[in-house]
Amino acid sequence: MSNSVRPAVKLTGIRKNFGLLEVLHGVSLTANQGEVISILGSSGSGKSTLLRCVNMLEVPNSGSVSIMGEEIALNHRSGHPSRPKYPKQVNRLRERAAMVFQSFHLWSHLTILQNVMEAPLHVQRRDRKECHAEAEALLERVGIASKRNAFPSELSGGQQQRAAIARALAMRPEVLLFDEPTSALDPELVGEVLRVMRNLAAEGRTMLIVTHEMDFARDVSSRSVFLHQGVIAEEGLSSEMFANPRTERFRQFLRRDGAASH
């Protein structure tokens, strides 16, 4: 299968338990290359768990995960936690599907420039000069080049999240995963992060985004997926879903979030 038609991410029959509680009930989702998919839902719907299953931060109890056509080999054993068969495969595929977290996860003892350089230099073992030049360019791109020598504690939340996006991009991933990237930000800082994400979407990046930003989901995402109680209750083109919700569950969700179509 050629790269032009190979899905970037394919989740099939994903089930995930935490103890006796099953939070995902056989969810299947395919993201094609260049698609921006927003994953929507109320708290506890399973949306962040689903995203974390993509790069094995949560290991599904059953089902399969493929990234760029390569399936992650898993050991599913009845009565036992599932685990990847080959940790090296997971580490390699995490470079292809980079995660941006709600809480930034920057190294507090490193400068912003060092944070962006860290993984390319020490995980991918790329040339230091190359890593430095690319990190500088990425910080310029997300609008915080002047903060290159600052430490995370010296930055606003929005600046820290933009640094986290630059750090993810430094791995040269084929897929970007965003887990509620604006939820921890003060309202006045949300826009600067969403602008960076809009620019990435305009470049044709493959992005899976768990978000409560309904305007962003409607205007930027090519498709949206609405999770309710661990299953996909509605999915489709974002423009169509927001203009004409097919299910009462999604209509209620939009009304509650103040995101009625316009």
Swiss-Prot record:
Q: Where in the cell is it found?
A: Cell inner membrane
Q: GO CC terms for this protein? A: plasma membrane
**SUPFAM superfamilies the UniProt entry points to:** P-loop containing nucleoside triphosphate hydrolases
ABC transporter domain location is 9-254
- Transmembrane regions: none
Do you know which InterPro entries this protein is assigned to?
AAA+_ATPase, ABC_ATPase_HisP-typ, ABC_transporter-like_ATP-bd, ABC_transporter-like_CS, MetN_ABC_transporter-like, P-loop_NTPase
According to its record, how does it sit in the membrane? Answer: Peripheral membrane protein
| Ligand binding (ATP) | G41, S42, S43, G44, S45, G46, K47, S48
- Tell me the domain of life: Bacteria
Under the heading PROSITE patterns, the entry gives: ABC_TRANSPORTER_1, ABC_TRANSPORTER_2
> Single GO molecular-function term?
ATP hydrolysis activity
SMART domains found in the cross-reference section: AAA
- Keywords per UniProt: ATP-binding, Cell inner membrane, Cell membrane, Membrane, Nucleotide-binding, Transport
The record's section on CDD domains has: ABC_HisP_GlnQ
Cited function: Component of the octopine active transport system probably consisting of four subunits: Q, M, P and T.
Homology family: Belongs to the ABC transporter superfamily.
Name of the protein in its database record: Octopine permease ATP-binding protein P
What organism is the protein native to? Answer: Rhizobium meliloti (Ensifer meliloti)
